[in-house]
Each structure stands twice: as structure tokens, then as C-alpha cells.
């Protein structure tokens, strides 16, 4: 929790320690001894545990009695096995046909058995058309795609992707930050051919390809990208490509066909390098030269592996099963894919206004902000592990607001702002980042943007309204259903759940303002965050004619909408629990411990129920905080059991191993936190609610150079018997960020049956 107490309950459970007169915590009997805080350990070989195929297939079907689902519910993880770097601008990977008879965005789908090409840009885990820049397809004269393949002939690992088509043509891909490298091999006696198309998944028109007049083995051009989730906003992607073998070229309108000489006695190999830029062909060429240079394919792939291994060593977990190690490091890999680099090697980038700017010395401008999703899990982790990069990310958003109309953008892809999901969620990202240690950005300017948007002084970014219905929200204290407010580009309903989103943002801004010393606005927005109470119907219809308090849509006259059920990607029962910033207040409204615990038990009977069932849907972000709510009741052991069930059952090592869209690492971020036994439950209140860790030991290398060790005494057990921080007992289920921001040691004593740990009212 921030150092200045909030005027109302923040929803955190205080921790208890025994403190000696000198102020040094001391251990008590029955508490596991704290290990010495370790020195920075040597790097482990961690890329071996990453499987980029996890999440590339559809979510397994729901159980029959809750299978009345919406199409969204069975969407896959939508991850990509593309070769890329942490935060890479280039993600060079395979594309397949879409999945028949179901919605599936362009990209790679594990269930498909053919590949249409290898494009240089992808987004990981999103459910809208994106990426697909400059697809390259290796073939031979007289043949066209797609090409059949088998997964047995396919390999994906960090920074590398390889596949052999059934026709014998082999493709290998790797990447630097802003460029890609490919190695194509044709069977002996075949004349290899590469087909290139200057297009993206946003548009198949408007592209151009030309040979470099000064280098007959080089090509350059551009194509139109953007229009993410049908935003209509577009941009240009520029490329410069070079192959290491001579070719004859057939250039068309936005296409190129390169034909190479055959080799009669041995397979023929062509290496191709491509740099991209959102500014110019020259910058694309410079990106390629500066990052790839004269390196061979194997050298680039080795460097990518080394870079990924270093990034993954930010968290070292040991002692777990091979399956759990694979799940953990694949999740951490997915977390590190975005936000992604948008500025060139020289610092140039394309502003939201369409002009060229420069990020400045030693700074990077970022894009790919899935804000509605990632504020709940990814951004606190990024700020804790990589505060300098997270600071650049937040400065990127501040700069974006300055060139797009004054408000923060929403879903940022390239230099576009898409109106995909409801709420003004970037303020939560910014507040989370700052309060978890990423302070290297213009925080005062960020607060000014937040306050101007919250008051209505500024309203939009690139024509996308930040807070639709703000006037009604200010007047009524909620968004009235009969005002028919278009809360985002896809929804005109969901006013009750969107009210919760607005209140969450109000709370986050209030905590950010408090941290910056603006106590007046902190108090105002803290008071406004209590608007969540205005959409809790105290007598909503329940089963067997009974009533119960539950989220409901409400009209402007104050009356509740009859049979209120559907909300934004969820329903009223699922959203009733989404008040993470005032959990004690929510518990009180819902009837206290005696009412909440059995209701949560019923709610959690199913773990991934979809949007049409009044149960937990862990595959979608509004549910991320719900499994931890037992920690604010007399039964924290139920959080321990529930979180472990989710880790074991809903996340697997299969291609279908994610419970829903990964949304640029949001779902994977939840797994990382839960496996460590921590979760940043309360937006903009830095700290963690606790559960039993998945691994016997973890070492977290913090961004400030310190380390935090997390240890358990009985690996495999679920229930917490006792816990300690630096040897001092923890009797509660919450620790403040300040207690671990400079490292230390958390130890858990675990058992196979529930204990009394954390159950008392004082521990919450």
C-alpha cells in the first residue's frame, strides 16, 4: 500500500511481524527459518523449457452442463510460434488458414495442416486481425500455396522457428529486435522460388516492391498496416530485404517472384535478411545493417537464444516438475513479448499524429498496449523486473497522448488507438508502473492527462472517446442502461460492468495523485470510485424466488433493469466480484463472511465457464482477481486450493494449454504471479496477496539489482501452515510492496490439510 493512508479502505490485509526494539524482525517458534538472501545466482539454461506452441490451439470444449457459450468463450490462446526477441518489432513466423466454422483471427492455428506463408509481424494472443506484414512463401515454379506440413517436422523455440513442408522445402527463421533472417532449403534439382507480397492482414492493397538499383540482390518497399479490430486507422510499414544468391525477379503490383538457380547434386540454400521500419525504407535498411550486419543465420539464432535466456533468468524457479517448468517459462516468455519496440535503431518513430519524432538518447518508444487486459497482471510484473523499460513504455503513452488529442490511447497497435474494450485503462497501467518502481517518465504530465480526461476537459485520442457517457457517470454515479451509451466499438450494453471499469480507473488515479502529492484530486477521485456501489442491486433475483445483492444494469430513474445478465465479455455474477480496490466494502455489501464464502464456493464450482454461466471464467481478464478473494474471508485455504487447481487444470503443456486469449501476456502473467504465490490484487496499491507457491524455490532478480527468494518446506503441498518474511512471521495474507522492493526472503511452511493461517479477522 502507498505510504499515505487512503481515506477509505483500500482492500488490503495488513501483515503482522514480530519486531525487536531495534526494529529488526525476528522469527518465532514454528516459523520456517529464513534462508540467507542469496547473491545473484549464475544464469540457468532456461530457454529449453519454453514451448512457443503452447496457446496456439483452441481452448478445450467446456463441460456439457455449462456449454451454452458465446463464440468468444472457446477462442484459443491465439499465441504465435514466430521467431522474435523480447519486445521484438519483428515476429517472423508461419501463418495458416483460419479454423473452419469458427472465428479465428489471421495468424497461426495449430489445428491446421498447411501454411500460407511466413509474415514478419504478429500479435500474440489477440482476437482481432493484425500483423501479417510481407508474407514470404518458398515454393517451386508451377506450385502455389498453401503447403502441407506435419507438426513432427516443425520446431519452435525462443528466437527460432523451423518447418519442413511435405514437399521437402525447409524454412528456418530467426530475428533481431528490428530485423529477421531466414534460411530456405530446396531439395536437390529444384529451382527455388520465393513469393513476396507487400500486404498485411489489414489490407491487401496499396503495397509496393522494387529492386534496389544499386544492389541486384536487394528489394525494398512498403505496405499498409493497422485497422486493428476494424479501427480504420492505418499506417505504412517499410522494409529492406536482401538475399545471398542471385535471382531473376518478376515484379507485379505489390508482389515479387524471385527464382533461383537449381543445384543438381545437393540441396540449394538461400538466406534472406529483412529489416523493417514504420518511418522509412532507409531506416529499415539501417535497422538491418546495424542489428544483423554480416552475421550468419546460426549466429543470429544463437544470439536470440542468449538474449532470451538472459531475459528469462529474471525469475529462476527450481525443483518443480518438467511440465510445470515448461508452463512457467513459456508463460514468462509470453509476458516478455509486449509491449513491443516501435522506434528504430536511431530513435525515430511514427507519432499518433502521423509525423516522425525521435524517442531521444537511450530511450525506446513502445507500442502494443493491450491496456484492458494487462493492467491486471503484466504491467506490475514488468515494472518490478524491468523498471527502466517500463518507464520508457509509460513515457511512450504520455507522448502518444500529446499527439493524438490529449487523452491516453486505448488499445495501441502501431500508431493507432483502437476502441476495442471499455474504460480508460491506460491510467491504471501508468499508476501500476509508477507504484511498482518504474518512475522514469513524466509522471506529472501523466497525472495531468488523467485528471483532464476524468473531468472531461479532454475527451479523445484519434477520435476514440476515452470515457463514453462521462456526463451521465458524473450526474448519476453510474452509466444508465437507458442512455444507450456506446461504451466501445463493439458494445452498447454492459453499462454496469463499464461503471466498474470507470470506478477502477478513478481509484487508480486517486492513488497515483496521492503518490505525487495531489491530495485534493486524490480525495475527489477516491470518493468517485465508490460509484461501484451504485450498480449493486441489493435485492436482485436469485434462485427459488430468493433475492441477493448482485451487480445489475440500472436506468436513469434509478430503477433496476429486469433480468439483467449480459455484460462486457461476461455476466452480472462474474462482474459482481470485480471490485478489487474495495474488497472489504464488497464483502460488506454482499453480506459478510457467512454469505460470501458459500457463494464463492458455488461460483468457483467451474473454473472456465465462459460468459453465459454464472461461474468463474478464468480465461478472461475480469475474473483474474476473483480466485484470491477468499484471502479476505475466514477461508484463505480455499484460495490456496483454488489457485492450485487452476494452475494444474487450466494451464497445460499442450497447444491448447491456455484457458483463453493470452492478450499480449495478460493470461500468462496471471500464471507467473500465481506460480510464485503472489498476486497484485489491488490496482495501484503496490503489494501482493499470498498463496502457496508452485515451486520449492524461486529467485526473483528485481530491476534494482536486489533479489527476492521464495521457498517452501514441503514441495507439492497446497495449504499454508505458516509464512515468514526475512524470518519474521507473516500472520496475514498480504505483504506491502515496500517490504520486498529491496529483496529479501519469503518462506512458506506447507501442509496437506487446511490450517488456521491467515483466517483471523486481524489477518485480513
Describe each region flagged by the PLM:
Residues 542, 546:
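Active-site cradle of extracellular carbohydrate-active enzymes
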Residues 35-379, 383-428, 434-500, 513-534, ...:
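Accessory carbohydrate-recognition regions in carbohydrate-active enzymes
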Residues 2-39:
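Ser/Thr-rich, Pro/Gly/Ala-heavy low-complexity intrinsically disordered linkers and tails
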Residues 719:
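Extracellular attachment/recognition segments
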Residues 505:
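ATP-dependent phospho-/nucleotidyl transfer catalytic cores
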